[in-house]
Amino acid sequence: STPLSGPARAAMFTGYTSHEVGLARNGTPIPDSLRTRTLGTLMQDAGYDCIYAGKWHVHTASMPDKEFGFTTIHPHSDNGLAEACVGFLEQKHTKPFFLVAGFDNPHNICEYARSQNLPWGNIEDLPQSEWPGLPLNFAKNPYDADVISYEQSLNYSAYPTRNYTPDDWRRYRSLYYRLVEKVDAEIGKILNAIDKQDLWKNT
């Protein structure tokens, strides 16, 4: 529905696309009329224990357990998130459950682009010889819309990538892939726990 985190997550949990309810940017509150019928409250009403771990970013002024039907078992942090979910899966359950694991990564590529510290720990950079190549559509064409350069100039302070060299972009792509690998390994811990607890038939 949108590439922005807050509006995209709000769409998932309310069932409404961002343009339907005016959620055009991060930090925009969900309308009051939508807060009482969300994915969490619907599952809760159906008899499920609703558990949330990790990044929320749906409604800035609230956490998932205050209005949206969830019990929170881990804060907004990728560190320890998988372990918290595994710990929950290893418990005895008398009711069906709905567990959401809200990983932040590979979002940390945004912090890298802004020359900020990565919030959930640094990742090892690969040698330049192992950086991926650039896509065929990387080169700027003379017929590209002027609005692309204009948009880049507006966002330069937040994402100072306008002056990136081809090698800078190759390193960026390499680090993005490493972040994907990192979160993939964390999700693997949760999937392994589902295997170990033989939960697939009831999950």
Regions from the PLM with identified roles:
Residues 3-10:
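Short, surface-exposed acidic-centric catalytic microdomains
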Residues 4, 31-37, 48, 133-142:
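Low-complexity, flexible helical/coil segments
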Residues 6, 52, 170-173:
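Short alpha-helical segments used as structural interaction elements across diverse proteins
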Residues 10-124:
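Catalytic-site neighborhoods of secreted/periplasmic enzymes
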Residues 91-95, 103-203:
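Active-site-proximal cap/lid insertion segments
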